Amino acid sequence: MTSGESKTGLKNVYPSAKKLLPKVEEGEAEDYCTPGAFELERLFWKGSPQYTHVNEVWPKLYIGDETTALDRYGLQKAGFTHVLNAAHGRWNVDTGPDYYRDMAIEYHGVEADDLPSFDLSVFFYPAAAFIDAALRYDHNKILVHCVMGRSRSATLVLAYLMIHRNMTLVDAIQQVAKNRCVLPNRGFLKQLRELDRQLVQQRRQAQQGEDAEKCEQEP
């Protein structure tokens, strides 16, 4: 094993960040409507890459599994500075700040169960804020993980892209799914759909306010 590799094979799963950025569209369609759960699931299935331990889904933002999170050597070699554990707790991935205490890693834990009945939405904004704070500095790199890196962690990353990157749920799913095989459970999808509706409504209201202000300023 070379110095650039880890026992989980992290070396070969860090693509160039430039390849991850989505194509920029001219504005958001005024008639956009949040799709149903089945339509969203089809987006996940379409073109999803083969499952691996960890993938970069946005520049400096990675989704991974328990194996990745427990590999302290691999995390250090890869240069991770932040870890968001979406399966924090004794009966899930029991790491916590002490697990990384002798490493330059900032930890944030979310105690969540991968069940459709679990309300993960209460963690959307705190988790998104943690990710956003980490990505404000170019030298930082954050791992968001759960057990498999498919449902809980993916849901929180999707929420981040929607809240802080102004993406619709469809845009966020397409961004993540082209880089990693993920599939949030139906309950989490329902919560993301509700977040999508709220954010789209807020943006439309903000745009209407800007348009009204422009009209008032015209002679």
From Swiss-Prot:
UniProt KW keywords: Cytoplasm, Hydrolase, Nucleus, Protein phosphatase
Ranges for domain Tyrosine-protein phosphatase: 53-201
GO cellular component: cytoplasm; nucleus; protein-containing complex
Binding-site list for substrate: H145, C146, V147, M148, G149, R150, S151, R152
Main location: cytoplasm
Matching SUPFAM superfamilies: (Phosphotyrosine protein) phosphatases II (SSF52799)
GO molecular function, one term: protein homodimerization activity
InterPro entries on file: Atypical_DUSP_subfamA, Dual-sp_phosphatase_cat-dom, Prot-tyrosine_phosphatase-like, Tyr_Pase_AS, Tyr_Pase_dom, TYR_PHOSPHATASE_DUAL_dom
Subcellular location: Cytoplasm; Nucleus
Domain of life assignment: Eukaryota
First-tier enzyme category under EC: hydrolase
EC number(s) reported in the record: 3.1.3.16, 3.1.3.48
Reaction catalyzed: O-phospho-L-tyrosyl-[protein] + H2O = L-tyrosyl-[protein] + phosphate; O-phospho-L-seryl-[protein] + H2O = L-seryl-[protein] + phosphate; O-phospho-L-threonyl-[protein] + H2O = L-threonyl-[protein] + phosphate
One Gene Ontology biological process: negative regulation of MAPK cascade
Residues at the active site: C146
Pfam families xrefs: DSPc
Family membership: Belongs to the protein-tyrosine phosphatase family. Non-receptor class dual specificity subfamily.
Subunit structure: Homodimer. Interacts with PRKAA2.
Main function: Dual specificity phosphatase able to dephosphorylate phosphotyrosine, phosphoserine and phosphothreonine residues within the same substrate, with a preference for phosphotyrosine as a substrate. Involved in the modulation of intracellular signaling cascades. May regulate glucose metabolism by activating, AMPK, an energy sensor protein kinase. Affects MAP kinase signaling though modulation of the ERK1/2 cascade in skeletal muscle promoting muscle cell differentiation, development and atrophy.
The protein, known as: Dual specificity phosphatase 29
